Design a protein with these regions (language model features):
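Glycine-rich flexible loops
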Residues: 1-136
Length: 136
């Protein structure tokens, strides 16, 4: 980010963090949402994903039926911090992890998982303990 700031004189509006996802910023909430949608659309276009993002519950049910190993994998090998913090309590988190894994494996790419020691450290962080208490 520092190199970008030095070269361009401002912070980037979009930042990708491995195992975290995309961070998008804008002056107003509507602009931020629109930019986030644009980023997601470009990613889907690049990956030739034509189907709309699935409803969480329906996608989880389909994965349980057709790819049960994904559910097992979800529980023990997280892709991103929200998966560690919220686990199965938030269907959107489960669906996102399964969706990402499905599309990565369909292309023959390797998954980059959060190592067990880092996942364990995450749940001990004060900020994450606070997020664990969130009600959905």
């Amino acid at each position: 980010m520092e190199a970008y700031r030095e070269a361009c004189g401002l912070n980037p509006d979009v930042v990708f963090l491995q195992n975290h996802g995309v961070i998008v910023t804008a002056a107003r909430g509507e602009e931020c949402l629109a930019l986030h949608e644009e980023v997601n659309a470009r990613i889907r276009n690049y990956l030739c994903i034509t189907a709309p993002y699935p409803a969480a519950d329906e996608f989880i049910t389909a994965m349980r039926a057709h790819r049960p190993e994904y559910i097992e994998h979800f529980l023990y090998t997280p892709l991103f911090p929200d998966q560690v913090v919220y686990g199965e309590r938030v269907p959107e988190t489960v669906a996102a992890a399964l969706y990402i894994r499905y599309h990565i494996e369909e292309r023959g790419w390797r998954l980059s998982m959060i190592p067990a020691d880092l996942a364990a450290a995450l749940v001990q962080m004060e900020s994450e303990k606070h997020r664990q208490q969130a009600q959905f």
